[in-house]
Amino acid sequence: MNEQTKAINLIESHKHLKLVTAKEEQSVEAALKLMRKFFISQLPVTNEAGEFTGSLNDNSLFNLLLENSEIKGKLVKEVMNPPFPFVAPNASLEEVSRMITKENAAVMVKNLMGDVHIITRQDIIEAIA
């Protein structure tokens, strides 16, 4: 791994894009539509105040849908996972990689302007490859 690569470098390819989030009060079906529309596999979840309160990812939603397809009608806040952790902009590639696990599909980072971005496995793969 490149020791020089920092968390802030990992968002380079999508730093110009607005972070896509699901709202706690949205239906799971609406969140799934967002994921399909933007070709993303994980979503941070925010409350009415804009605070990050949870997360969704395709693996957990897949398992929930297999158990009960009616889950689509539930609210996001009823099925969401814990929020993705934040990393410092200067966190190393190795640090970020260790934080992304089976249970934790992504991490969040705030740039110098205060904008929040998501770092996923795909971002790490792109940095290494």
Spans of features found by a protein language model:
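The conserved cystathionine-beta-synthase
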Residues: T21-F39, T46, L65, F86-N104, ...
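Short beta-to-alpha loop/turn elements within the nucleotide-binding domains of ABC transporters
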Residues: Q26, L56, K74, A91, ...
